[in-house]
Amino acid sequence: CPQWGGVPAERCVQLGYYCLQLPAMAAEPGKAFGSRESQESDVRSVRRHNPLALPADIDGQPTWQNLVGDLAKLLEHYRPEVLVTPHPELDPHSDHVASTQALLEAIALSNWKPTTFLMYANHLHDNDRWPMGPAGAGIALPPAIEPLPADRLWSPLLSADTQLDKAMALAMEHDLQGGQAFKRQLRRWIQQALAGRRWPVTGSNEFFRKAVRRHELFWVRDLSD
């Protein structure tokens, strides 16, 4: 996916921490939490092609302390001014919230201090269909259910070619591959016949409709304070 987006391999780093384990890791920072699916518990298995050594390479333990240490090392190595991360108040996915928390802890630990967060939301607390409408359409602001910090917005336009590139990059994500369950596919056929709804040809997963739009939407948070 990164290489499709023009990011060279030498700037891609695999960390290898396990899905849906970040909140538990944050609650017990020194305890290792392995994969729920494969029972694997050594993050080094995916790191053999990384361009630099990281703190967790020493013991391979999937702990919160190792994650924060890895992120701090990456900050000091690449020295980014801007970081892209899930919105911790808007996106309720537990791993997304915890990943931004880990990033904030890493910034506090690191000698390098980025200046800006660009934050996005893949999910909402009360509505997983946002943004509404077809792929290629615009993105409206999410419903204002709870008060949020007063962040600025940035909404860059995407050309048709860039939208296709984004869809192709998404198609390389293993959890977005494959067809829909029969019940969901049947519901789509009914919606298509009765309401004229259409889904993108690039992928059947709902994320292809939600994520590939004619512009992006980021909340911009100043970290300089």
Feature annotation, model-predicted:
Residues 7, 20-225:
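Metal-dependent de-N-acetylase/amidase catalytic core
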Residues 1-14:
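Glycine-rich phosphate-binding loop and adjoining beta1-alpha1-beta2 segment
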Residues 15-19:
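Short loop/turn segments at strand-loop or loop-helix junctions that form parts
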